[in-house]
């Protein structure tokens, strides 16, 4: 056997060292990385993607746009992504009715990088961030990564955000950063603007990061409308990974007062957005009307799934996003496995008794509902008796 084959058979170089052997920061020991299961199954409803593929016109535009910049790949991209940010400002001005300019926008590789940059600029050692749980699991992970102390306040029993209770928690803890997701992931509820005003008025210092990753699905107006009212306190983050069907393109952005963008520029890495990403995202924005045409279809499907699951005896949390949180299961992890055994991948988000399912294509949702009808007879805390 050759030496190369012996090495391949023995395993990767350096495997004798474990994570415990490394000089890792003490505050990161024992932590777990983010990760939704990536499994090859017939029905994948676990990562809240838009199930509708891009149109051929969009594919052709992305291909042509990338081809146009390919000849310049030996050069660094536009460091500040001015053209892309200008296009994003135009899109949001049209969608929200709030006049925005390039100075109000910043873009990065997914909204998680946006959140990380915000925590680098406004969080860090000696500072704190508060979240209202259950909510997006990356908020505490990014806080840990930037050595920002993570504080927790609970949502109501129905997972909604009680503005009065949340304001009291802010008043008591006085965090430097307040995280609010609207619609909330994993429960799906939106937060009305009046409730956000209550939180912002309570804050004596710091910023409120309003995570609108699922904003295009929401029945509530965007908090972008409040930026001019609270320019030193409010930052709105969004993504093209959900409604925009651009998850593979990895493009997130924030909307804020120009001074906030100036702050982020202090911590961003140079040339962080590739020429290819910028070109592809601009092409996607040119086809916004066609792509977002699927939003109404997904909302209708979400409502159909909600009604059907409710009729089967499940408790379904009313959702303003492209997913539903449902239960109440006697053993959610075990039920998650039974869905997987049936070829359906949904998400165990760590809430006892509940699982989350993305709204898929009609035929995918039919498979989910068929399996759910069978599981309702055995998996719920109060199983529905089978009909003879």
Model regions: which residues?
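PLP-dependent enzyme catalytic core of the Aspartate aminotransferase-like
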Residues: 2-3, 194, 334, 338-342, ...
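Conserved PLP-binding catalytic core of the aspartate aminotransferase-like
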Residues: 298-299, 307-342, 359, 386-388
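Short beta-strands and strand-loop turn motifs
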Residues: 46, 150-154, 176-183, 208-211, ...
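Short Gly/Ser/Thr- and Asp/Glu-enriched loop/turn motifs at secondary-structure junctions
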Residues: 40, 102, 317-323, 350-354
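PLP-dependent aminotransferase class I/II
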Residues: 55, 233-310, 314-317
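N-terminal small-domain helix-loop-helix segment of the aminotransferase-like
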Residues: 6, 14-110, 117
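Conserved core of the PLP fold type I
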Residues: 72-203, 214-230, 235, 294
């Amino acid at each position: 056997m050759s030496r190369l084959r012996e090495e391949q058979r023995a395993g990767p170089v350096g495997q004798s060292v474990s994570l415990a052997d490394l000089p890792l920061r003490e505050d990161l020991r024992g932590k777990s990385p983010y990760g939704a299961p990536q499994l090859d199954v017939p029905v994948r409803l676990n990562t809240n993607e838009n199930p509708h593929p891009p149109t051929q016109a969009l594919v052709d535009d992305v291909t042509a746009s990338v081809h146009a910049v390919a000849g310049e790949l030996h050069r660094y991209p536009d460091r500040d992504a001015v053209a892309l940010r200008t296009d994003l400002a135009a899109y949001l001005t049209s969608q929200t009715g709030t006049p925005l300019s390039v100075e109000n926008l910043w873009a990065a590789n997914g909204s998680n990088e946006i959140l990380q940059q915000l925590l680098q600029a406004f969080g860090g050692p000696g500072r704190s961030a508060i979240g209202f749980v259950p909510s997006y699991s990356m908020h505490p992970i990014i806080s840990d990564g930037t050595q920002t102390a993570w504080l927790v306040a609970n949502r109501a029993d129905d997972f909604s955000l009680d503005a009065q209770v949340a304001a009291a928690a802010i008043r008591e803890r006085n965090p430097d950063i307040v995280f609010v997701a609207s619609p909330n992931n994993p429960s799906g509820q939106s937060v009305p603007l009046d409730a956000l005003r209550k939180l912002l008025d309570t804050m004596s210092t710091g910023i409120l990061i309003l995570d609108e990753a699922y904003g295009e699905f929401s029945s509530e107006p965007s908090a972008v409308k409040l930026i001019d009212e609270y320019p030193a306190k409010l930052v709105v983050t969004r993504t093209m990974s959900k409604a925009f069907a651009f998850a593979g393109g990895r493009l997130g952005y924030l909307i804020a007062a120009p001074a906030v963008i100036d702050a982020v520029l202090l911590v961003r890495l140079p040339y962080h957005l590739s020429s290819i990403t910028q070109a592809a995202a601009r092409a996607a924005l040119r086809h916004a009307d066609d792509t977002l045409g699927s939003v109404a279809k997904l909302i209708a499907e979400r409502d159909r799934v909600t009604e059907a699951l409710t009729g089967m005896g499940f408790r379904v949390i009313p959702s303003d996003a492209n997913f539903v949180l449902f239960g109440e299961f006697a053993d959610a992890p075990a039920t998650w496995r039974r869905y997987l055994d049936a070829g359906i991948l949904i998400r165990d988000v760590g809430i006892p008794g509940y699982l989350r399912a993305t709204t898929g294509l009609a035929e995918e949702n039919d498979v989910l509902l068929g399996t759910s009808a069978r599981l309702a007879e055995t998996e719920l805390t109060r199983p529905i008796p089978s009909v003879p």
